[in-house]
Amino acid sequence: MSTSSSIEFELNGQKVNALAGETILQVAKRHGEEIPHLCYKEGYRPDGNCRACVVEIKGERTLAPSCCRVASAGMQVFSNNERARKSQKMVLEMLLSDMPEDGFKWSDEAGDLPHGELSDWAHRLEVKPRPALQQIARAPSQVTDASHSAMV
């Protein structure tokens, strides 16, 4: 697949072809590579808000959200190396730690995925929130916001 409307880059050490304007996440999905993602949905504008889909791009200092980063020729992308996986897992863990313990009743009748896609990705990446994070996230606030009379 080497046409003028496609470019070639490396994804986890494998050469892949991307169509012009295609994001790293779209290319990865097309080539059978799974990258965690929560806020991306085909057909909608990608915003990269959840940060679960971050990848490392060789030569760049910061991780990039694969859902809104357009692939470019020659780039080397790593979605499953230690740095990317650690960040992906941290995002999932932080989100899980702030969820209700019993989950959301609407998501899964069997109870296997109490938090929907979040539970699914956490299960796939073997992420479980640390009890200390859950305690912090669920602790009642000790500070009362008195910045406005309606809030007291």
Could you say what each language-model-derived stretch is?
Residues 7-73, 87:
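N-terminal cofactor/phosphate-binding cores enriched in small/glycine residues
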